């Protein structure tokens, strides 16, 4: 799958590694701080973009790995309308994405992640989708990680 990741912290770093190892293509890393995005993007030959005025690439899935408190402001980010969007926050409902897209859900890693980890252990994911198709897509994607 072609992937865009929003975030450059612990979860984004670990998930990016898993995505790349699974053979998916990371197109972009987006962060409020473009320099932070550039550091992570350089590891995967991806583009770095700012969340302030993003121009997102056309991807199969957009993974939002931002702080839980930032999810309420996703509607202000241009370029996500009607994309397949998932977030990684376990404490936030999938419906925080309902005004952004018609296909959305959650891809939540069921353990604490740190970007300093030398070897990434096998990570179980909790998945949730707003409809059967979204749930199927997220489940199949998670199985590859």
Regions picked out by a protein language model, each given a short descriptive name:
Residues 1, 24-28, 58-62, 81-85, ...:
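Short active-site oxyanion
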